[in-house]
């Protein structure tokens, strides 16, 4: 009986979720990505100042 009650509550919660069409959401996602691409390290790459993988420059005296 407890199982059925939990399933019913889960189904009610899922029924109340607001759904949108994929065509609308994909347009919003593209707009968001275009708007924020300058701050996205995966799109723009790290700057020289904030690149933890850049080789450290050292001075060697000969």
From Swiss-Prot:
GO BP term (any one): sensory perception of taste
Residue spans of biased composition, Basic and acidic residues class: 53-62
Cysteine methyl ester modified-residue sites: 59
Tissue expression: Predominantly expressed in the central nervous system.
Coiled-coil ranges (or none): none
Subunit structure: G proteins are composed of 3 units, alpha, beta and gamma. Interacts with gpb-1 and gpb-2.
This protein's name: Guanine nucleotide-binding protein subunit gamma
Gene: gpc-1
């Amino acid at each position: 009986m407890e199982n059925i009650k939990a399933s019913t509550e889960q189904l009610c919660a899922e029924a109340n979720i607001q759904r949108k069409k994929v065509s609308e959401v994909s347009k919003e996602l593209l707009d968001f990505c275009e708007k924020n691409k300058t701050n996205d390290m995966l799109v723009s790459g790290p700057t020289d100042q904030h690149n933890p993988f850049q080789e450290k420059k050292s001075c060697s005296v000969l």
